[in-house]
Amino acid sequence: MDDVSFEVSADAYGRFMGRFSGPLAEQFVDLVGVEPGQRVLDVGCGSGALTAVLVSRVGMGRVSAVDPSESLVEVVRTAYPSMDVQRSGAESLPFPDGSFDAVLAQLVVHFMTDPVTGIAEMARTTTPGGVVAASVWDHAGHKGPLSAFWSAARSLDPSAPDESDLPGVAEGHLAELFAVAGLTDVASSSLTVTVEHPSFDDWWDPFTLGVGPAGAYVTSLDDAARDALRDRCRQTLPNAPFRTRATAWTALAHV
């Protein structure tokens, strides 16, 4: 997994993506049907948005989590000191075959170095009859949480890397990756969250923290280009307070 743009503080990560990933996690866990008594794994846990929901459903002792970012692993370890949290990419999970009843990856597959291998590893560590599930933002359909940002960026710089070509972000592609990884009877769906922004700065400032491709793009700009992008985003968005909606594709399969 590519952690170059995610070796950041938990505060920065939370301000940038946590406002969307928190509410998404509740819906995602409901979709998967995680139940008390199950052993579950959070692949690419980040600062712990999905982890927190899993802990609330099955208890700390039945959740494990991995992430390639050491700083984010330490955040989750601190929050859940008795939980098994390890630094690892998805492509080589440090668990025996069939260790978990459910293995989930929220907003991770599109950043895996090798998504097919990562999904296959998720399946390997799932017990027979268990569930493998993933979600990714609809960047290709321009319905993700960063769509307004990338639309503004590309209006000024057509070469801006808007994440629309990442693995799994187009409708149906996440399910295709599951199939290539060897999973069958893959169910696809979508989930949508709505986030309130009390001011433009509340929306904009997290983009300046260097998180993910969008944050890396902003920090790569000189002051004039950054100010121009900020102004273009302000022109694009409604007057504050305003809401943004974000849709994620999901794929789910039983092993």
Task: For each feature predicted by the language model, list its residue ranges.
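Acidic/polar helix N-cap motif
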Residues: S92, P96-D97, D114, A170
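Conserved hydrophobic/aromatic "anchor" residues
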Residues: V4-E7, Y13, F95, F100, ...
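Conserved class I S-adenosyl-L-methionine
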Residues: M1-Q38, A49-R57, E70-V75, A79, ...
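Conserved catalytic/acceptor-binding region of the Class I
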Residues: V116-T117, A123, T127-P198, A214
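Class I SAM-dependent methyltransferase SAM/SAH-binding core
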Residues: R39-L93, A102, T117
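Conserved Class I S-adenosyl-L-methionine
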Residues: D2-F6, F20, S47-A49, D165-V255
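A short SAM/SAH-binding and catalytic strip from SAM-dependent methyltransferases
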Residues: D101-P115, D138
